[in-house]
From Swiss-Prot:
Protein name, per record: Ribonuclease P protein component
Any Pfam family matching the protein: Ribonuclease_P
Family listed: Belongs to the RnpA family.
GO molecular function terms attached to this record: ribonuclease P activity; tRNA binding
Gene label: rnpA
Complex and partners: Consists of a catalytic RNA component (M1 or rnpB) and a protein subunit.
Catalytic activity: Endonucleolytic cleavage of RNA, removing 5'-extranucleotides from tRNA precursor
GO aspect biological process, one term: tRNA 5'-leader removal
NCBIfam families linked to this entry: PRK01903.1-1 (NF002507)
InterPro entries: Ribosomal_Su5_D2-typ_SF, Ribsml_uS5_D2-typ_fold_subgr, RNase_P, RNase_P_CS
Function as written in the Swiss-Prot or TrEMBL entry: RNaseP catalyzes the removal of the 5'-leader sequence from pre-tRNA to produce the mature 5'-terminus. It can also cleave other RNA substrates such as 4.5S RNA. The protein component plays an auxiliary but essential role in vivo by binding to the 5'-leader sequence and broadening the substrate specificity of the ribozyme.
Keyword vocabulary terms for this entry: Endonuclease, Hydrolase, Nuclease, RNA-binding, tRNA processing
Amino acid sequence: MYPGMLSEKRTNALPRGEIARGKSAVSRLFSQGGRLKGGFLLLIYSASRPVEQAPRIPVRVLFTVGKKLVPRAVDRNRIKRLMREAYRLEKNILTRALAFDAGKGDHQVMLAFLYRARADAIPSLERFRAEIRHMLKNLLSNRLPQTREGDRIE
């Protein structure tokens, strides 16, 4: 198993390796990924073969807040911090459902959460958690191809 992924001790951790990085991977996600709209978040997702830098990490995630919608850096940073925390607390929905076999490492899901509301009133952590929980459940039930052992993701 991926260290810390489904263990009892660090179930809710969000290690650095799970944060999506790299211009080519991110641009591929934005150009070819599917989209799922929520109330104030947009989720862009893609399932593919693992990248060389992180072959054993089943889910990689990215959080962005546009400068045009939220001009103040302090507000953008607060929103990204809230999104990261909400995802960290709700990611078990996704990781348990994927039933990732680290020995195979045959697929990787990339997610990008984009904040798309104005910064007039920043939502609370509970609202972010509810939104991300709803989006992850919707992603698993309708959008993401089956990823159980034996199935393939193209």
